[in-house]
């Protein structure tokens, strides 16, 4: 009996956890007229099988834990067994007597890169198989000799639940009976070429244990009762191109913390953050990545769980509750999503089955030297499918209203941040990443077809053409693109002392040359208030009064310029310090009138932007903007019209010097009475109350190419919005 393993290579492979097809040996098999059940339970002292005539003992045929039963009549399948360990006995079913439930169609579509809902196939799924409740595990590891599920249910022993491989697909599967929600698990993988043993978390894991642990957690689905059907119906019908979009960019872990400095949960945030956004007039929130990530300081941009909300703030259903509350409050939710790179943590995607599976082998294609991360191999169908399924998952399962795609420029260019000799050209000899381009197009087509009204927004920092134009017209297919050029020019201009701004006037005007080449978002994002760049307030020149006046003027310019809007949390408070991911925003600043004034200004501008069609309807159309005068560099003044689709308009006048400009004549296309509907210099905002509060009447005095004109007061470092009527 003790020499059996020497005579049986199958058993040797089981004992050494090297069997490529354990189902061919373990479980129930027919040998001529006889049936054999083989059971490997290394921690069991004794085992029994339930047959039609009752419980019968299994023979221990190898001291390492192999039990066998032989009989002429097959037992009921799946086979029910009883095990005894350390004097304790329990009943379960033999995992090797369950049939496969993977269909050839699923495997085919996955191999083609077209299994959009791969998250319903891969990962760990609570289910009932052949009348027995348990969990089905599926993972892709084509270069593995053997894959096992290990967890708190099998002593984390890779010999116990060795999986079934489905031919050349590289897809491994096993159903383990009796497991329940919250069981922890990983995959143990033996590489076919090297014999290296790797312990990996689930790429399709739906939730994970608390840090620093890295195990995935079996998670139940489908129990949350959504209340946002009306929102989704309205979203599908909405004309987002002509609708207001004023987005509040938020890192959930540092927006606000509790009295002990600990994270607020998704549900607590729903009850604090959502009412705040309503009060402030935001239309959307953009969440910095909430997909699972190990390091706070990565801000979520080094993702290890592409299908798992981070458990820092609660469960997946808690995040669903947060999104649901946003929708019921009329606020859309955009998820920051990171398909451009992934971290090198040895327990996650990196070298997943001992080979460069999700990434390229060659570091000239497969590594971001700047970030110390790997680049996805977009040309591999299964990798592309993984990412497409991730995007689909967040939109389908969490009702997200769109994706902000991070670092698109790094995906588009093979030579991104690389020196000569550090990159490989494409098949045409160029520097464009053709596989990434195809992936992005496929992503955008999928989102727009499957989720009507959902948005895709590109953080793309180059002049790549047609990023936000439809794929059928030759574009990448994004809904919108961040206008990094406008943002950089504007912040550069604002940091100059007002006395020198006259020499940099083109930074205010140049953006109109390309403003309608894309559907642009004007972003003052988290990237502008970290890593020594200083807070927006600290960028502003001058004394305290001038700093706050400049900041009020900057917000007025952003909210009246062509393009949708985005501000990082804290911009509306006039944070004095840079953003710190490990602490809350400085809410105590609102005890000071300067900061209170900035918050009031942001709130009033947000509501005005939503209420006045001229400020949002034609953000992407040159007909929505007209320069009245863009050439007054000597006085650092610009003024322009913003128009709505019905021809109604507002007049915007901005003064970028601390000099009061009274008696300033400006042309206007319409005679009559005008009123000031916004003034950044109002005392309510902390300003000096210089303006046009009594209204204005045009004069039949041609000016600036128009038949009529107004004589206005433009406050120092201030902006006013004037409307006919």
UniProtKB/Swiss-Prot annotation:
UniProt cross-references to SMART domains, sorted A to Z: Aamy (SM00642)
Catalyzed reactions per annotation: Transfers a segment of a (1->4)-alpha-D-glucan chain to a primary hydroxy group in a similar glucan chain
Coiled coil spans: none
Annotated keywords: Carbohydrate metabolism, Glycogen biosynthesis, Glycogen metabolism, Glycosyltransferase, Transferase
One GO MF term attached to the UniProt entry: hydrolase activity, hydrolyzing O-glycosyl compounds
Location of the active site: 406 (nucleophile), 459 (proton donor)
Similarity-based family: Belongs to the glycosyl hydrolase 13 family. GlgB subfamily.
HAMAP family given in the database record: GlgB (MF_00685)
Protein name: 1,4-alpha-glucan branching enzyme GlgB
Organism: Methylobacillus flagellatus (strain ATCC 51484 / DSM 6875 / VKM B-1610 / KT)
Lineage: Bacteria, Pseudomonadati, Pseudomonadota, Betaproteobacteria, Nitrosomonadales
Gene (UniProt): glgB
